[in-house]
Every structure is written in structure tokens, then in C-alpha cells.
Amino acid sequence: MVKYLVGGMLFLIAISVSAQRITGTVNEQLAESKTLRPITGANVYWSGTSQAVSTDTAGKFSIPRITQSNLLVISFVGFRNDTVRVGAESELQVVLQNDQTLNEVTVRGNATTIDRLSPHQTEIITTRALAKAACCNLSESFETNASVSVSYSDAVTGAKQIQMLGLNGTYIQTNIENIPSIRGLASTFGLNFVPGTWIQSIDIGKGAGSVVNGYESMTGQINVELQKPDTREKLYLNTYINSFGRAETNLNLAHQLNEKWSTALLTHASALRSRIDQNKDGFLDLPLYTQYNVVNRWKYQSEKVMAQFGVKALYEDRLGGQKNFKSEMKGSDAVYGFGAKVNRYEFFSKVARLFPDKPYKGLGLIVNASLYDSKSYFGRSNYNGRQETLYGNLIYQSIIGNTNHTYKAGLSYLLDQYKERYRDMPLTRNESVPGAFFEYTYNHLDKFVLVGGGRVDFHNLYGTQWTPRLHLKYNLTDETTLRASVGKGFRVANPLAEYYGNLVSSRSVVFREQIRPEVSWNFGASVTQEFKLGEMDGNLIVDFYRTNFDNQLIADMEDPRYIVFYNLEGKAYANSFQAEANLTPLKRFELKLAYRLFDVKQTIRDMNNENVLLPRMMVSRDRVLFNAGYALPYDKWKFDATLQWNGKRRIPYMGPVSDHQHEASTMESTMSPSFYNLNAQVTRTFPKWDIYIGGENLTHFRQKDPIMNANYPFGENFDAGMAWGPVTGRMIYAGIRYKIIK
């Protein structure tokens, strides 16, 4: 029975009738099989009171009767609320209906949904959404999302990078099932290492995240949930091929061993073997590659214990550079080549102690160990990196008096061992960081929610770090929600891994000084307005966030001869404004229109060693996104199209070295043109399988000369790290999905 406190007399009355309980099960109905599936974590509460419980992993709940209300409200994100008038019955069976605004949600669609209950501004992307696009891996799941933009980091390696709130993905804490994963050396290719068919859902949170997950979140937090062993699909097969010659196969297998044990095997294999040079500059537009990726995971579920554990393994081999380059030519002075081999191994476990009679209470332990090993070369330059990581997080949660006041407290430990070498320059670093955290939540009937927390971490290299964060949510009306947040972030940068694409150049790498940790403060606010005009549903989301840096890693590429790393001296900030409208003018027809504005600046030293505040490189100031999606009845045919307009951005001066002045007037002058990009997909669904065909960059826009001085790759002006637009033109793809439901 969930504890509550509504006054002494009411408390005594509730205790006296505690034997009179309402129990039940909350389910959703699966469209494919018409069967019921339990909903875990649904909110069940008496209308107008703070008396509330949550459903367990079997969808079950138990709540005492009260005298103040006989209206029982059941709610869960992505489903329509259900209100049941309770009479003499004591056992309820509730089936929640999919909320239309979420039922059709897609990263490429117009109804990316804000979690209505969370004080964090959180967008939710579901499996159904991912199936509407090819989404071959995590990086491609954001290509049409208004908040997150994706681009290639250079014109040779094929590495992709994301931006949110005007800053690179390294400032976003990216977790896999609440375990920090795409960080450190893995930030180079990590987004490519999570196949789309493995993903169950993606949460995108703006602003500093929860202190429970660590101190590295600066502009946001992305959490990816993978397919679970007890998923409803015992077999899921996806095949994909595109006009560039890229092919991949994904196979997910899940098996329920008995009532408590289940297991799953997630596999992926992909390759690109076609040598493509559309712009005829003599370099491959995309690297050849082969990737093998597998996860074996297990789950144990009992009334009092839930445990998940498993292993991951990945191997990838990339080869790029000039079109006639072969791997045996590595180190050649005549032909420029790029190569990268990555091996990654990981063990993870999550164990939770449950308290069935006190669902608000829990104790969890997360343990993760990983090894990331990469060996790369860029022409005659070698770069090797190895990262060994051990992570542990012990979390206890409970209430203070009643469920209006909850808290999480715990201990964490992070061990990172880095061994890098670029040319003849070794970079070795061992970080050992024990920490403790506390986070308090006040929730008044989901109308006003306050989450305040702090953590203290004892870094062996950089001393004690204090990280406070605060999130607020207030519902002005049932249709209007305000959110605000402020928080500090702290991270240790890995310059070579984070600017990996810039190593494909003749630039000399210079560390002007010892690089200190990056420290920032992020604050922002948002308003979400739901509305209904006749038969048209919709919402409007407007937000503004600002990130101020106390210290930031500066990667100075103003001089085409160098990439110089040093600490911030002066100001650095990022302002982000976004307005997004989602409309459903007709049944199964969705429209989305979003505008985003970035104002991002940092202080750079000019040739006279004076500080100049300039717009940050490679950040588009403006972006407009328009999406239209339509589905025929029963989703037999689904159509989706997205048009993006990307505004101008400042790019480095790439003229002759003799003309370069490295002064403010020169640094301000070089801007890329704006461009449009169109993506579209059509899907035909059948009871057990889907067939889809689509295209990307249908406008066929390509950056002119993405590689500077491509004819002389060993000359002083060679640079492939200045890609600001698409390197390849129009791409057509097709695929098949097949599934067997348990």
C-alpha cells in the first residue's frame, strides 16, 4: 500500500479500511495480434487526491479505497488516460488506448512527443516510429528530428556527428539503457554502432540531465532502450540495400525460457564494397567497410528481484582515401589512404531489489565494463586509441512521508584508462572518479513537479567536483505546460577522438597547453501548448536554452596549416531557440513544421595573440524542417516525406597559406551556402512483414569540393575535414522486415 498523508483523521480512516483494496491489471492491445500486453509503470491514482501507485512488471496494481473519490485515473505516456468510476467491484481490468499523437510518432514524422509527466523536456521516439524510416543505426534515427541534426564529420572517414542546442554530440550524455556508452574514444563512430532494429525507444532530453546518471551531461541527455528478452517478437529480421551498394542484415531472436527467465540474441552484419566517387575528385565519397555486431542478453524476473545482464561484441573495418588505394598500400607516399579497425567488447548487468507492497521503493545496482580498441591511419600518420572503462552505479529510491515527496540517493564509480598515440605523440590518462548523489522530487498531482539534485565527485586528476541541477514543470491548464531547468556539467575532453575527421588533412596537431576539463552551466525554459480546432489536433512547442562555458576545449582551425588545442580564455556560449508545430488536420495525416535558431560563439586567439569572439565553426545558424506523413486505414500503406533547409555556417579559411592573415576580418568572411535536403519513404505492410522503399538527399545537393587540394593529398593545403554539406548525392534504398510474434 502506498503511504500517504492527507491529515490525521483521513489517515486513520484509510488505515481502518486498508483491507478494502482495489486491485487490477493495466494492459495495451497489440494491433498486430489483438492480444493484451501488460504496461509497466502506469500511474494509477484517485482523482483529486495524491493517493497513487504504479503498475508492476506484470501490469498489476493494488490501491486502497478512499472516501474522498470513486474516480480512478489510469495514465501512461503514449496512451490516452482512462477514468474508471469504481463501484462495489474490487478487481479491474483496464485496457489503455494508444494516444493518437504518439501512435503515429516517428523521428521522420511530425508528432515527436513530449513526455507530459516528466519535468525534463523529453521527446520520445518509439519502435513504431523507427520502422517508418530505414534507421539503419542510431545516427540515422535523428536525420529528420527538429532538435537533433546529423552530419558527416569529414569527407573521408564516414564518421557522423550530431548537434543539439548548438553544440556537438560530445556535450550530450548518450546512454544505452541508462549506462553512459557513447563517450570517450567511442564518440568517433559510436552512433554507427547501435543498429536501428535493436532500438526499442529513444528519449531525447534537453538541458542538463539527472544527476543520477553522472556529471557529463551539458546540453542534453539521450537514452536508448534496446529490445528486451521478453519482447513480444520472438523473431525479427530486417534486410536493407541501397544504390551505393551498402547492404545489411539484422536478426533479433527472443525466447522465454520459463516464467522467470528469458534471453535474446541481437545480431547485425553490414558492408559497403562499392567504390563511389561521384564528384570525380579521385577520393572515395564513402569508405568501404564491414561491420559485425552482436548482443546476447538475459533477464530474470521474480516478485522481488529483477536482473538483466549480457555481453556485447563489435568488429568494424573501414578503408577510404583515394579511389585506387588498397589496404596493402598503407603508408604509401604515392597514394593517400585511410583505414580504421575497431574492436569493442562490453559486459553489462542491472540488478534491482523490488518491494511489491511498496512500489515506490527500490534498490538497484548497475555495473558495466567495456574495452574499446581502435587502430587508424591517415596517409602516413597513424593514430591508435585504447579505452578501458569500469562503471558502477548504486541507486536507492523511496519516499519522504508520502508519494508527493520522493528521492533517489546513491554512490557511483567511474574508471577510465586511456592510451592514445598520434604519430610520435603519446597521450595517456587514467581517471578514477568515486561519487555520491542525491535527488529529491516533489510532485503535486502531476500539476507541479520539482526535481532538485546534486552530486559530488572526487576526481583523481581534477579534484572535487560539485554538480547541482534543478528541473521544474507546471501545468497552467490541462493543455499548457511550462518547464524550466538549470544545471552544471563537467567533462574531460578527448581532442583527437572528438576531432577525428580533422586528422584527414595536412594540418599539424598542436597542444598549446595542458587541457583542463570543460565546465558549463545550462539553463532554459519551454512551453508546450496542446490544442484542438474542430477535428484537427495539434501542439506547439517553443523552447530556449543557453549554455555558458567556464572552460571549453578550443579547436582552433583558423590557420589552414594547424589544428591548435587550448583552453578557453574569454567567453563561450550557445543560445538555442526552437519553435515546433505538430498538426493532425485529417485522420492519419500529420504535418510538422519547425524552425531552429542557433547563436553560438567562442573566443579564439588571433595571430597577434589577442582574443576575438567569433561564431563557432561548422554550426548552421538557421534550420527549417517540414514533414508530412500519411497512412491508409490499418496502416497498409504509409507515406512519409521530410524537407530540410539548412542555413549558412562559418567555415575555416582554406585559401593559399601565403594569403592567410588569421585575423578577425579574415575569420569572419568565409561562409558556406545554404541548401535544401529532401527525404521520403513508402512502406507497404502485411500481417508478418513489411516492404519499404525510400530515398535520401532527393534534391541531389552536394558540397562542391569537400576535399581541399584533393589532387595533392600530401601537400600543405590538403584538408578533408571541412565537410559542411552532403558529400554524396541522391540515394535510393529498399528493405524488408519480417517478424514472428510470440
PLM segments and residue spans:
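Flexible loop and strand-edge segments within Gram-negative outer membrane beta-barrel domains
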Residues: 272-293, 299-363, 369-387
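C-terminal beta-signal and adjacent terminal beta-strands/loops
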Residues: 645-659, 683-742
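Extracytoplasmic beta-strand/coil segments of soluble accessory domains associated
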Residues: 64, 139-183
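N-terminal periplasmic accessory domains that precede
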Residues: 90-95, 138-141, 160-163, 175, ...
